[in-house]
């Protein structure tokens, strides 16, 4: 009897006979008519006894005086010997007293079928049996990370607000919604975040925002928008950053967090967008706060003719975590009101101002005052940085901020026309600054 484990190929053949024959007749004809045909090495009876040939399976039926059926023979020989045996079957021309014809239809490679089974089964094993162990490893890693983050989190003020360890010592803070947001920022090395703990803004937040440069960093949903609106009315917020639409700060990746903080919007522009009454403060007080915080830092001072960039407000922990270097440049000791160009805008200015009103869109112009393209106001700073000298003027439906002025001066723009004037510490020389209300 042929062992299933040693079978390499299975020979399949069809048989037809001009008369009534049965299985024993077919098997007898196979053994009888191939005996001595291929020599002693390929004698079917001897091969079956030694296990090189399997059991000959015959399925046959009779109808209308004729018999038809199939034959299958397992073989453990290699391809050449198996092909010889298959060809020998087709030499059989008689079964019992009847004329017969045998035709080999195919030779199946059993090992190929086994290989296919092995591949399919290995895939299932990989998914089903290794998945559980992988999850356990991830859970252990996450538990360790969570433990470290929980140890770093502190609670400040009378309200016991969850905060990063650097909130009290830092001159810039991130105001987020909840404890989970603080933990996620700690995960990526941002240690100057403090949570408000809901829409009811506690006094500790108001006090911190009055002393530090504060950036509100909220979820990209309706709840985040409501918190921003309340913060603007009760706290001295300087910038607003939002998570991508539909996402929460606690679930953001490192890349998404950095992108959101880089795209923060000055508070003046946000207040204009929401059309709400802001937290009461004078323009001079805003500038004084920011300048005093800058002077408190032990940084080397170097003179810069026109550009006064604003530092990043997310403190990143060194060195194994994200590093954000803050470069500070000289700021004038005394606040000076910006000298705004007092001339009436030309007619073509007015046309573009009216066209952009209420769209929160910026229009870039070339040297000949021809429009280049329109961009969203939130992307204006990035577009100017990447302009490479092609942009010579901008008209936009937004607030003219110190950051935009600095970038415009750095890129050599001739004019900057906005809807409103924000908190400006210094107007660069050589650039016309006009508001649409002039």
Swiss-Prot record:
Write out the GO cellular component annotations.
cytoplasm; DNA-directed RNA polymerase complex; exosome (RNase complex); primosome complex
Keyword S-adenosyl-L-methionine assigned: no
SUPFAM superfamilies reported for this sequence: DNA primase core
Instruction: Kindly list the GO molecular function terms attached to this UniProt entry.
Output: DNA-directed RNA polymerase activity; metal ion binding; poly(A) binding
Q: Which residues bind Mg(2+) 1?
A: 177, 219
Identify the residues that bind Mg(2+) 2: 219, 221
Q: Which UniProt keywords apply?
A: DNA replication, DNA-directed RNA polymerase, Exosome, Magnesium, Metal-binding, Nucleotidyltransferase, Primosome, Transcription, Transferase
GO BP of this protein: DNA replication, synthesis of primer
Q: How does it assemble?
A: Forms a ternary complex with MCM helicase and DNA. Component of the archaeal exosome complex.
The protein in question is named DNA primase DnaG
**Whose protein is this, by species?**
Methanothrix thermoacetophila (strain DSM 6194 / JCM 14653 / NBRC 101360 / PT)
List the top taxonomic levels of the source. Answer: Archaea, Methanobacteriati, Methanobacteriota, Stenosarchaea group, Methanomicrobia
Q: Which gene encodes it?
A: dnaG
């Amino acid at each position: 009897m042929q062992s299933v484990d040693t079978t390499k190929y299975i020979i399949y053949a069809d048989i037809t006979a001009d008369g009534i024959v049965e299985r024993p007749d077919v098997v007898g004809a196979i053994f009888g008519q191939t005996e001595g045909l291929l020599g002693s090495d390929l004698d079917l009876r001897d091969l079956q006894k030694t296990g090189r040939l399997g059991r000959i399976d015959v399925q046959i039926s009779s109808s209308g005086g004729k018999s038809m059926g199939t034959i299958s023979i397992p073989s453990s020989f290699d391809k050449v010997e198996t092909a010889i045996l298959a060809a020998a079957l087709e030499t059989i021309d008689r079964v019992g007293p009847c004329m017969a014809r045998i035709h080999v239809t195919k030779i199946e490679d059993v090992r190929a079928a086994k290989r296919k089974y092995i591949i399919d089964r290995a895939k299932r094993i990989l998914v089903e049996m290794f998945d559980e162990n992988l999850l356990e490893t991830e859970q252990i890693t996450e538990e360790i990370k969570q433990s470290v983050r929980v140890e770093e989190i502190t609670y400040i003020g009378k309200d016991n607000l969850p905060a990063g360890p650097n909130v009290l010592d830092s001159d810039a803070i991130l105001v987020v919604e909840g404890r989970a947001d603080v933990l996620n920022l700690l995960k990526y090395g941002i240690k100057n975040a403090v949570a408000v703990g809901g829409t009811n803004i506690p006094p500790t937040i108001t006090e911190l925002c009055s002393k530090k440069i504060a950036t509100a960093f909220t979820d990209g949903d309706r709840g985040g928008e409501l918190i921003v609106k309340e913060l603007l009315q009760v706290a001295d917020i300087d910038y607003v950053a939002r998570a991508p639409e539909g996402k929460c700060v606690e679930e953001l990746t490192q890349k998404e967090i950095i992108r959101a903080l880089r795209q923060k919007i000055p508070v003046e522009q946000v207040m204009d967008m929401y059309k709400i009454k802001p937290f009461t403060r004078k323009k001079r007080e805003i500038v004084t706060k920011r300048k005093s915080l800058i002077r408190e830092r032990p940084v080397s001072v170097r003179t810069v003719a026109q550009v006064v960039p604003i530092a990043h407000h997310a403190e990143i922990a060194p060195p194994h975590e994200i590093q954000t270097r803050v470069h500070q440049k000289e700021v004038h000791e005394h606040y000076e009101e910006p000298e705004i160009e007092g001339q009436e805008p030309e007619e073509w200015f007015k046309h573009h101002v009216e066209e952009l009103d209420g769209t929160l869109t910026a229009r870039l112009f070339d040297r000949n005052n021809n429009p280049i393209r329109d961009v969203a106001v939130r992307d204006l700073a990035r577009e100017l940085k990447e302009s490479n000298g092609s942009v010579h003027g901008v008209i936009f439906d937004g607030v003219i901020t110190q950051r935009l002025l600095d970038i415009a001066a750095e890129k050599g723009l001739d004019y900057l026309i906005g809807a409103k004037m924000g908190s400006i510490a210094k107007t660069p020389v050589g650039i016309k600054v006009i508001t649409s209300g002039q």
